[in-house]
């Protein structure tokens, strides 16, 4: 075998191994059926992030939409506490519908993906009367100017009995230990 063929074969094996590893990792977790049902019924989600001291912030109610694969999308100002903490690597704790609704912890990231921006621009006015009449309505201009950003939250771990209490130690993104 030539050096080039060996290199390509090695790269192919490595990519296959990485794909298998990633598919089993928490970052590829999905929303539970309970969460999917709750997303369909809820008008708000409550989001908390992790402060520098490792404790949970206060849960804030926010408008939301989801992607077809049930990834949560919200928008916020680029200098909000949520955005600052997420840039620092904070996960997001999410309660669907109310502060004691179904909860999960997710990998949060700020993205400038035009498709996700467009989803928010399109979905919010359909879901929220205030956006329909022009109040707090997201627009491409706001995204382009950087006055709002998209936060994408991918569910990682279900939190079946977790309640929102600011100042408590935040749960880990790591999967729960089997019983």
Where are these regions (language model features)?
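Short N-terminal segments immediately surrounding and downstream of signal-peptide cleavage
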Residues: 29-48
């Amino acid at each position: 075998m030539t050096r080039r063929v060996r290199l390509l074969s090695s790269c192919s094996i490595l990519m296959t191994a990485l794909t298998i590893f990633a598919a089993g990792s928490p970052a590829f977790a999905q929303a539970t059926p309970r969460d999917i049902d709750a997303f369909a019924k809820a008008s708000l989600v409550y989001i908390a992030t992790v402060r520098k001291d490792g404790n949970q912030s206060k849960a804030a109610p926010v408008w939301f939409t989801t992607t077809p694969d049930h990834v949560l999308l919200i928008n916020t100002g680029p200098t909000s506490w949520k955005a600052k903490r997420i840039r620092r690597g904070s996960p997001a704790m999410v309660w669907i519908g109310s502060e004691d609704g179904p909860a999960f912890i997710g990998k949060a990231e700020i993205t400038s993906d035009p498709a996700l921006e467009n989803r928010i621009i399109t979905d919010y006015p359909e879901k929220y009367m205030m956006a329909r009449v022009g109040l707090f309505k997201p627009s491409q201009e706001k995204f382009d100017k950087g006055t709002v950003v998209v936060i994408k939250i991918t569910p990682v771990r279900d939190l079946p009995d977790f309640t929102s209490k600011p100042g408590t130690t935040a749960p880990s993104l790591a999967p729960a230990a089997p019983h």
